[in-house]
Amino acid sequence: MNLDHPKLVRLLRMAYSAEKAAAFAYIGHAGSVKHPDEKIAIKQIEMDEWGHRKTVLSIMRQYGIPVSWWNEVKYHLIGKTISLSCYVIGWFMPYYFAGRLESGNVCEYFVMMHYFNDLGITEHDDELYEMGIKEKEHEIYFQKSIENNRLLPLFEKIFGWGTANSFNDVDLGNKYSVKASKAYCQHRNK
């Protein structure tokens, strides 16, 4: 079955490649931190990203959606560049920008769910929900890691993400069910 939804196809192809960039970035991030608990947590996030990539590819294959080799090259280079930069930009910035990135990624999976549902397809709801919630958990991990850093207010003012601002409306303390989660990220569902 082919999907007649160009936005969904584009989002799936981008998410597949962007997960590789994120995983590569977390390899560098984990390597650059000194505390063993931080290394373990970031390594787990890296593994989650590889898992998301595998799940997205499975969905793409189900609908005959080819991988974008342009995205693969682009995001490969982005991920490797970020990975290397983690060793030179200090402790705060990798945490900040990882959290900011994860905040936006939350909605990618809920928007995919919306697009599939627009086509009458609900079979991917559970896995897309789980990936969106996992991205939110990643966002919260990075957010809590820097919440008391003196640079956070400045970065939040400049880049629009931090303890007071998120790019999604998911609240882990009051999670919606899979069915009700269709209310998430409506601001991005355009």
Pin down the residues of each PLM region:
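Non-heme di-metal
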Residues: M1-K190
